[in-house]
């Protein structure tokens, strides 16, 4: 096959999509690793993937439940009740949210619209609340997938909020958002919303009630939306780092009228994280006090509808209360065990990390292993690790404010996790030997 023609020779593509195709060398490691992932049976010589935020600890149980409880019938082959979700599923999502998110006012089925995942929900939300070029505020570091969710479809602008050493999930962070809002609007970008990942990805900690209240007051002051991505709501765990962790607090649990016009508050949830099913594309927007936004969201849902099959799988799980009563505590136990294993091994190698109490990843510091304090050096280390058949996510893709941060997914089967860490530490040991540095307690760096 011949090489692809240069971009300037592609007049048949729109300018808006050409922006999506601009070269991004930070994504090249991911592209190289994706189809080489390790599997002990089908690809034993592959790359151990510790970069993707997937919870693999309960996959067997979820798979078993699906296979035992799902059967296609002719109704699944129809358009069903339309693109924004069946009444049955939306009722069960509402019941689930009322039980686990503890909203200050009950969530109802008509407050919810479904789609094919959390990412499409973010895209649709942006499409509805502003114009191309308008901005949505997110603090650094941030989940790298938000770039595509926000910018590739709706053509919103992801406006990055620098933290400069301030904890992103703290009350103090709000001042950074306010300063960034003023700077953005002075340069011509109208800010329409704030997006919080609660719990935070990649840092793995929830926002406190006080911090959420402060963000609500900030958004109310400027009449901008607050979108809370709560896909890790159930993925919390106990650890020696946080024996009494800050509990997950949904934005919906606040007495919102004290802080903000409730019509500005919205939540995204999906099956991907808490239910260990990134590949089953179904999620939702929850907006209890803004019927107009929900109507707008539904008006474009035909482009992002979840399949009847995906909706039925999630519905079956919601309907099985006894399974969920076992499943979530067991998931948390396994998350805690896996987190303890990874952080213990990191400590053996004197590798610092950001303590976490939620999510499936840990944020680590490998800055001492960089050749130089640059993004290119960070990318070079990521490539070296990938070629040594271990893939971790580099901090630059999360717009980390420090070079040398990486994210490791610890919610991985133990054998795979052990193999991946062995490969990681071997590379770090080699680097230390090349520099004449001492090795760690196990012979690794």
Segments and roles (model prediction):
Residues 95, 103-106, 260-261, 374-376, ...:
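PLP-dependent enzyme catalytic core of the Aspartate aminotransferase-like
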Residues 74-221, 233-262, 266, 423, ...:
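Conserved core of the PLP fold type I
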Residues 335-336, 349-387:
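Conserved PLP-binding catalytic core of the aspartate aminotransferase-like
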Residues 2-117, 124, 168, 172, ...:
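N-terminal small-domain helix-loop-helix segment of the aminotransferase-like
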Residues 138, 160, 228, 392-394:
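Hydrophobic residues in well-ordered beta-strands that form the structural core
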Residues 264-358:
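PLP-dependent aminotransferase class I/II
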Residues 221-222, 349, 388, 431:
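Helix C-cap/helix->beta junction micro-motif
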């Amino acid at each position: 096959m011949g090489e692809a023609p240069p971009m300037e020779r592609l007049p048949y593509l729109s300018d808006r999509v050409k922006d999506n195709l601009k070269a991004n060398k930070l994504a090249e490691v991911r592209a190289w690793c994706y189809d080489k992932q390790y599997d002990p049976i089908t690809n034993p010589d592959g790359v151990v993937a510790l970069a993707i935020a997937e919870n693999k600890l309960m996959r067997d149980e979820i798979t078993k439940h699906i296979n035992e409880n799902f059967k296609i019938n002719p109704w699944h082959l129809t358009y069903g009740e339309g693109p924004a979700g069946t009444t049955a599923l939306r009722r069960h999502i509402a019941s689930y949210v009322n039980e686990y998110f503890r909203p200050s006012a009950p969530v109802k089925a008509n407050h919810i619209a479904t789609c094919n995942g959390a990412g499409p929900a973010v895209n649709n939300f942006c499409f509805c609340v502003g114009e191309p070029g308008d901005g949505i505020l997110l603090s650094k570091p941030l989940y790298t997938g938000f770039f595509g969710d926000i910018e590739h479809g709706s053509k919103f602008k992801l406006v990055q909020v620098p933290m400069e050493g301030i904890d992103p999930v703290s009350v103090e962070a709000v001042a950074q958002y306010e300063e960034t809002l003023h700077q953005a609007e002075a340069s011509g970008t109208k800010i329409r919303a704030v997006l919080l990942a609660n719990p935070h990805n990649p840092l793995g900690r929830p926002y406190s009630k006080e911090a959420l209240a402060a963000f609500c007051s900030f958004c109310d002051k400027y009449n901008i939306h607050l979108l809370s991505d709560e896909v890790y709501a159930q993925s919390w765990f106990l650890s020696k780092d946080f024996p009494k962790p800050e509990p997950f607090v949904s934005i919906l649990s606040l007495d919102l009228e004290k802080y903000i016009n409730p019509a500005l508050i919205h939540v995204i949830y999906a099956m991907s994280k808490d239910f260990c099913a990134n590949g089953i594309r179904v999620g939702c927007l929850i907006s209890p006090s803004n019927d107009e936004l929900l109507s707008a969201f539904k008006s474009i849902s035909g482009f992002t509808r979840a399949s009847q099959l995906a909706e039925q799988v999630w519905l079956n799980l919601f309907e099985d209360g006894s399974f969920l009563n076992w499943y979530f505590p067991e998931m948390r136990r396994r998350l805690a065990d896996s987190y303890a294993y990874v952080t213990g091994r990191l400590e053996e190698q004197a590798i610092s990390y950001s303590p976490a109490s939620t999510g499936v990843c840990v944020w680590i510091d490998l800055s001492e292993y960089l050749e130089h304090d640059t993004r290119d050096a960070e990318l070079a280390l990521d490539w070296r690790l990938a070629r040594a058949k271990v893939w971790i996510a580099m901090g630059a893709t999360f717009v980390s404010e420090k070079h040398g941060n990486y994210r490791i997914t610890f919610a991985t089967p133990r054998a795979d996790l052990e193999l991946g860490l062995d490969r990681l530490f071997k590379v770090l040991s080699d680097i230390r030997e090349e520099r004449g540095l001492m090795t760690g307690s196990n012979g690794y760096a």
